[in-house]
């Protein structure tokens, strides 16, 4: 998914629609080999910068390890250097024609405009852009595992870091909401189970985090801990497992659960306050 947005006064709406329709309908006319090589270099530098940061190579290894070969999530979005080097002008043109048509886009307008005026203006600027080929929505592929898989990486980092990851259902499911809430309860504050046990009581980790990585055909549930220097990572992992076992067996602390539910409700209300956030939320759920 690529997001484009413009925040303009009403009298500049036509200009914004014209610019976006020009991008969708006529960009290929100015993409030549020189521009492709220039942008390829930009992306490659972005990849190097990311990988040269502490723990920057971890997610590539996680993607390859968590999903089987052939799964769309078994490689990172930015791709490998070999993939970037191999991308041709024809590849770029074919990809653009396939995915950047109006049949694969959602356009939302929010603000001082009525529905009929919006329809007229959008038709004026976008109606002549040809649709791309019909697209088949990918089927969900959670890549369930029947065994534990372990990987050890060595890199120039300030301290050891433990990633525990589970392949779980995709976004916009009941399970996704549960995992999102669970991550907040597990690490949401100094009284949360993982933080309290690892950082405060045992003092074997300097930080601990958890999050649900929501994607279209599969999700991932992460728990991450940074190990205190000199502490055996196995001790930290064992403590993480104990907390998770108790959490699964007994469920969340009712007070923590109530507090996190209230925080999530507030966040959801804040998400629809501004026009941009309204547009984003609308497009996301289309």
Which stretches of residues belong to each language-model region?
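Conserved, carboxylate-rich catalytic/transport cores that coordinate ions
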Residues: 96
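M16 family metallopeptidases and their MPP-like homologs
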Residues: 1-24, 55-82, 104-110, 159-170, ...
């Amino acid at each position: 998914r690529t997001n484009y947005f413009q925040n303009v006064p009403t009298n500049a709406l036509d200009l914004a629609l014209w610019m976006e329709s020009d991008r969708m309908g006529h960009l290929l006319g100015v993409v030549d080999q020189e521009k492709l090589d220039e942008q390829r270099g930009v992306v490659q530098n972005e990849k190097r910068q990311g990988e040269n940061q502490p723990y920057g190579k971890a997610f590539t290894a996680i993607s390859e390890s968590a999903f089987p070969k052939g799964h769309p999530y078994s490689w990172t979005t930015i791709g490998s250097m070999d993939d970037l080097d191999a991308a041709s002008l024809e590849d770029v043109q074919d990809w653009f024609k396939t995915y950047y048509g109006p049949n694969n886009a959602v356009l939302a307008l929010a603000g001082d405009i009525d529905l009929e005026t919006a329809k007229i203006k959008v038709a004026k600027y976008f109606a002549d852009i040809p649709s791309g080929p019909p697209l088949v929505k990918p089927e969900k592929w959670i890549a369930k595992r029947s065994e534990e898989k372990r990987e050890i990486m060595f890199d120039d980092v300030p301290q050891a870091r433990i990633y525990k990851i589970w392949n779980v259902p995709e976004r916009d499911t009941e399970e996704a909401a549960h995992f999102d809430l669970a991550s907040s309860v597990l690490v949401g504050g100094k009284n949360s189970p993982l933080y309290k046990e690892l950082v405060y009581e045992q003092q074997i980790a300097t930080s601990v985090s958890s999050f649900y990585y929501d994607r279209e055909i599969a999700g991932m549930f992460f728990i991450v801990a940074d190990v205190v220097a000199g502490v055996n990572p196995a001790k930290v992992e064992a403590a993480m497992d104990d907390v998770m076992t108790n959490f699964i067996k007994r469920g969340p602390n009712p007070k923590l659960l109530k507090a996190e539910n209230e925080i999530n409700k507030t966040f959801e209300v804040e998400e629809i306050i501004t026009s941009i956030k309204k547009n984003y939320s609308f497009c996301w759920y289309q």
